[in-house]
């Protein structure tokens, strides 16, 4: 296996939504009113030759419209790893919001 076959994978939390357990599950559960926030992540997958971003997240304005707290912009989360978001050519989108 060469070094180009080995990737590092980073989960980068950028925001959250305060909510209760019942909001996170479809079926009734114990303690439905207990706090259970939902965290929001983007992913960076990289090796010496390539960087792939999984999902792109949202900014402060979109977070506010959706009632979410954005702790840092996704581009800033990537920058914490030395990744310039504007130079990434490969992006995987796992789902859409509408």
Please identify what each model-predicted range represents.
Residues 7, 14-81:
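Conserved beta-strand hairpin/beta-sheet module of binuclear metal-dependent hydrolase folds
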Residues 82-87:
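Beta-rich strand-turn-strand
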């Amino acid at each position: 296996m060469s070094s180009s076959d080995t990737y590092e994978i980073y989960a980068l939390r950028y925001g959250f939504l305060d909510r209760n357990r019942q909001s996170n599950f479809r079926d009734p559960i114990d303690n439905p009113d207990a706090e259970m926030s939902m965290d929001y992540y983007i992913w960076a997958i990289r090796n010496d030759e390539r960087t792939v971003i999984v999902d792109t997240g949202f900014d402060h304005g979109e977070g506010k419209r959706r009632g979410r707290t954005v702790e840092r912009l996704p581009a800033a989360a990537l920058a914490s790893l030395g990744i310039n978001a504007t130079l990434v050519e490969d992006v995987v989108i796992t789902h859409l919001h509408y």
